[in-house]
């Protein structure tokens, strides 16, 4: 039986853990608390004064600013495994962190499954590469395409909050994100390595494949060299774009067929992700195009962009991928912000449609804006009427203008306050009241209908009549429905695709 260690933490509280290493990271050893509600991670080597000051700021300054004692502060606690305390033991510095939520550990995996076992962490790497997810992850652990969109939304939202605090992660990658594709959740880990304003950043520059090209280009320079590009918010943006691309498409955006240095694999990697970085789906420069005949069977179909192009992620994400990997790959100021990713992912989640093939592994797909929509994952064409709601709003009660925002309708789909009014947020600030559905959609007696549940202003602008709470309106082609007549209120115009 391991010995119980009792320490007094920096804030005077008692920390108790067993003297038995339960997990090891790149620079830390992890011990479990006696009640298994938290872990204590000790750096293997003594850390310098700068790192101590930086970690102290993370634990005692920024934690209190982000995790405020209110609804919004509690909301963020699910998004980060944030250090809560600092301890010293045997001349080494340790950080106290909450135990990961149980949803971030595999469960329900058959004992006969040879690869992943129950109790293993759901490290993001399992779900980012086609080879890993196709060979090693059981089908019932993969989640749907919509779940993966939600997962990416949580990551983008977490990074937006981090950046708003002036912090950068410095090593954002699939290794430092725990994910649960079954519930669409994600948690940012290794928060002790954050880049804190006015403090020297940690010496780690990131994980290969996620390091921004401009950082990789100067990695050989000493850390105090003014020409060295160090991790910061702008470099996080590159890593975030790569992470979203890999989680949705299960391939790396820069891993194409071009070999930049045939003699030195390290130089080849440095060029591939650094000075010569080139998007594998670049529309005009095919230099780094994927050579499908060189892919392993387990990398297909996801590894073949001609079969599953990035455009299957929808127009909002396609635009941001272009900015990240074409316009901004060697021009960091153009790379999309975490907020832009968050907003695009919210809109994309409203563009999804359930696949009509019950055996489809993805279950959902993004509407492709054609008259014959089909699931890109299994090839099943949509059959029947497909209603699309186009959102319009009137700035200062003027003429209604398009928002370039749509909502796909499917049976039992719900309408929320953030759909009816563009001033209502869909994020950590959404009130409990605004999280309640205000309407729902059904296929009833051969037609699609919208039932009004909680919108006092709903009005059929086509037939010039109010739609009271509890009443419904048919979704006919071209019908205009006012959802909210107040400031920010939206008008929807119905479009019907018949296939």
What are these regions (language model features)?
Residues 2-54, 74-82, 88-90, 433:
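ATP-binding glycine-rich phosphate-binding loop
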Residues 78-147, 200, 205:
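Conserved structural core of kinase catalytic domains
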Residues 150-152, 159-181:
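Catalytic-loop of the protein kinase fold
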Residues 189-195:
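Activation of the activation-loop gatekeeper triad in protein kinase-fold domains
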Residues 201-225:
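Conserved activation segment of eukaryotic-like protein kinases, specifically the C-terminal portion
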Residues 231-237, 244-318:
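Conserved C-lobe activation region of Hanks-type protein kinase-like domains
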Residues 322-352:
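Terminal C-lobe "cap" of eukaryotic-type protein kinase domains
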Residues 459-499:
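C-terminal boundary/linker segments immediately following FHA domains
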């Amino acid at each position: 039986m391991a010995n119980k260690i009792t320490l007094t933490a920096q804030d005077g509280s008692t920390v108790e853990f067993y003297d038995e290493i339960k997990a090891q990271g790149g620079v830390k050893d992890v011990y479990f608390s006696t009640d298994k509600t938290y872990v204590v991670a000790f750096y293997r080597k003594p850390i310098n004064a700068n790192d101590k000051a930086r970690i102290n700021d993370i634990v005692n300054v920024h934690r209190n600013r982000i995790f405020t004692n209110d609804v919004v502060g509690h909301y963020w606690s699910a998004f980060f495994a944030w250090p809560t305390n600092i301890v010293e033991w045997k001349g080494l510095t340790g950080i106290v962190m909450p135990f990961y939520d149980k949803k971030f550990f595999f469960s329900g995996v058959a004992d006969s499954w040879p690869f992943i076992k129950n109790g293993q962490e759901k490290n993001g790497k399992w779900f980012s590469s086609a080879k890993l997810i196709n060979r090693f992850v059981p089908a019932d652990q993969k989640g749907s395409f919509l779940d993966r969109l939600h997962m990416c939304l949580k990551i983008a939202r977490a990074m937006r909050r981090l950046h708003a605090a002036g912090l950068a992660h410095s090593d954002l990658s699939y290794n430092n994100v725990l994910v649960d594709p079954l519930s669409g959740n994600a948690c940012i880990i290794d928060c002790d390595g954050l880049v804190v304003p006015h403090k020297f950043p940690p010496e780690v520059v990131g994980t290969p494949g996620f390091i921004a090209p401009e950082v990789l280009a100067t990695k050989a320079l000493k850390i105090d060299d003014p020409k060295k590009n160090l991790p910061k918010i702008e470099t996080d943006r590159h890593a975030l774009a790569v992470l979203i691309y890999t989680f949705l498409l299960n391939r790396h955006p820069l891993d194409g067929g071009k070999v930049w240095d045939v003699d030195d694999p390290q130089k080849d990697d440095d060029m591939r992700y650094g000075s010569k970085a080139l998007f594998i789906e670049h529309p005009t420069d095919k230099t780094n195009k994927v050579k499908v005949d060189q892919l392993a069977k387990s990398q297909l179909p996801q590894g073949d962009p001609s079969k599953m192009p990035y455009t299957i992620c929808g127009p909002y994400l396609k635009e941001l991928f272009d900015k990240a990997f074409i316009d901004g790959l060697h021009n960091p100021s153009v790379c999309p912000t975490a907020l832009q990713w968050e907003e695009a992912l919210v809109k994309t989640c409203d563009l999804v449609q359930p696949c009509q093939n019950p055996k489809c592994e993805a279950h959902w797909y993004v509407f492709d804006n054609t008259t014959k929509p089909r699931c890109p994952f299994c090839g099943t064409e949509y059959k029947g009427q497909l209603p699309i709601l186009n959102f319009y709003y009137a700035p200062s009660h003027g003429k209604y203008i398009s928002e370039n925002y749509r909502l796909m309708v499917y049976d039992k789909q719900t309408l929320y306050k953030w759909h009816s009014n563009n001033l209502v947020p869909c994020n950590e600030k959404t009130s409990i009241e605004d999280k309640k559905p205000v309407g729902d959609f059904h296929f009833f007696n051969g037609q699609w209908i919208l039932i009004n549940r909680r919108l006092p202003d709903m009005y059929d602008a086509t037939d010039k009549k109010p739609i009271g709470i509890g009443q419904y309106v048919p979704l006919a082609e071209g019908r205009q429905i006012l959802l909210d007549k107040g400031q920010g209120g939206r008008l929807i115009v119905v479009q019907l695709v018949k296939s």
